[in-house]
């Protein structure tokens, strides 16, 4: 069912502790059970499984429950041992897990959506289960009565969700590339603002209530940090992945962001430094360096008897430049560019060697990651992917945590 990986920890990369195998289809979500050597998984094969580590070092399912529809999302509240499972048919089912994690009792079904559930969160204080779905809406339902409290529709599929429990604000990412901030009330709501910055669909969100930072990952391979608490519209761009960003997790203790992409890439970003905002791209009818006209500037082309050029942009200064004035490429990590991007020749000369020092570390998960979650107290991460395999990692070598891991890599 599951293998224990016998490898010696390396100081510079995540340590693979265990593989959990046995699902017959894509694993949609996997969550580590706090203070236990256990993992809860939800899969497209219509099963919910609770895996506990045995004396042999292998993981075996102590709970194996078959649902009526493929499982698409999951939320687990450890203190109350309540689990909420979103399904492809739009329903959310609540279960209660026994103290020994060997039994799971059905509680109730919530008719939350008309289509696939994409994300779920549970708020104990208000007794709300909040969810998003491919029916283009966010809904919040009362877990006491099972009744619908509110619903808001977007223009495209709602793909991911984060919730601020203290202020009752919800952040919803959608397939159009927008993030909507809503204030949820008992029977009403208000749309606060919409955040736009990605060029692809939003695939993952993470909200840090301490620093009031929102992180978003998207299919455009990039991550944006939105400084909500600063109230100045400050954003930071992080580009280091070569495929769509599938999951992100911010470690408040060490000020590090962990991100995973569909190609198996795992990145750890240092956010405990003063990063620079990437500039807005400037628009011009001619190169802002040599003043040669761009190809749509017919008048200047006619007046100067020259051919029009293609417009490019310097990633460091944002100026509109032609190809001849931007022949160089450079990384510029302080602005979030971890690999080489186009810069104008004058900006290239201003970048020193020390400016190219990476501010992130990159690692290989060796499977197509579709979901990731972490247990901060133990420095553990669990990833799952389209290969039906769940992997448990010790992240302490790369996230700077000195906390002892509960998963042995003997």
Predicted regions and their residues:
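C-terminal interaction modules of eukaryotic adaptor/scaffold proteins
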Residues: 248, 260, 382-410
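Conserved strand-to-loop turn within each blade of WD40 beta-propeller repeats
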Residues: 42-45, 86-89, 132-135, 166, ...
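Cys/His-coordinated zinc-finger cores
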Residues: 313-334
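Canonical WD40 repeat/beta-propeller blade segments in eukaryotic WD-repeat proteins
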Residues: 24-32, 68-76, 115-122, 156-163, ...
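An edge-strand/N-cap motif at the start of beta-rich repeat modules
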Residues: 1-2, 9-22, 32, 39, ...
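Per-blade loop-tip surfaces of WD-repeat and WD-like beta-propellers in eukaryotic adaptors/scaffolds
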Residues: 2-16, 50-71, 78-82, 88-114, ...
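Cys/His-enriched microdomains
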Residues: 285, 312, 320, 342
